[in-house]
Regions:
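Hydrophobic structural segments
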Residues: 1-101
Length: 101
């Protein structure tokens, strides 16, 4: 028996520094799609290149809050989301792929 996986690769144009706008793109795809897996690009939430924005604690706090909101909205939904975003962990900054399932 062959099982199929439905995959959506989102090629969008995130706006540099506009976390709210970029987050809404993610939410819209999450809420309006029946795929098993949704893949977003590198630095989806911050836009590219974020340059010195990612060095500002208030900006990174907004990134973490946006990821938390997406996680909460995805609870009970089927798609797994892979989201490219900068991630600050214990003072270390990473160019990360966050998997939300």
């Amino acid at each position: 028996m062959t099982e199929k996986i439905s995959l959506l690769v989102v090629q969008s144009n995130p706006v540099v520094g506009n976390i709210a706008f970029n987050k809404q793109i993610v939410i819209d795809h999450l809420q309006n799609n029946n795929s098993d897996l949704i893949l977003f690009s590198e630095l989806m939430l911050t836009g590219y290149p974020p340059e010195d924005l990612i060095l500002k604690p208030a900006f990174m706090k907004k990134v973490h809050e946006a990821v938390d909101e997406i996680v909460n909205l995805s609870k009970g939904k089927h798609p797994t989301v892979v989201l490219g975003t900068p991630w600050l962990d214990e003072g270390n900054l990473f160019n990360a792929a966050v998997v939300i399932h």
